[in-house]
Amino acid sequence: MKRTYQPSKIRRARKHGFRHRMSTKNGRRVLAARRRKGRKVLAA
């Protein structure tokens, strides 16, 4: 059986990247929460 996680840099960036997060209200909320927490990396 094929494993479920087949990594792709493009798919990762498009689904979880900074620009995608900024494109929705809830995505911006995620970024704000990560900034508040002091995350070094905000998005993929």
Swiss-Prot record:
* A single GO BP: translation
- Which domain of life does the UniProt lineage start with? Bacteria
Query: One Pfam match, by short name?
Result: Ribosomal_L34
Q: Where is this region: Disordered?
A: 1-44
Any one Gene Ontology cellular component term annotated for this protein:
ribosome
- Report the leader peptide range: none
Database matches in PROSITE patterns:
RIBOSOMAL_L34
The molecular function terms of the Gene Ontology recorded here are: structural constituent of ribosome
InterPro entries linked to this entry: Ribosomal_bL34, Ribosomal_bL34_CS
Which key words are in the record? Ribonucleoprotein, Ribosomal protein
Entry-linked NCBIfam families? rpmH_bact
List the HAMAP family hit by this protein, alphabetically: Ribosomal_bL34
Its family?
Belongs to the bacterial ribosomal protein bL34 family.
What is the name of the protein in this document? Large ribosomal subunit protein bL34
| Native species | Streptococcus sanguinis (strain SK36)
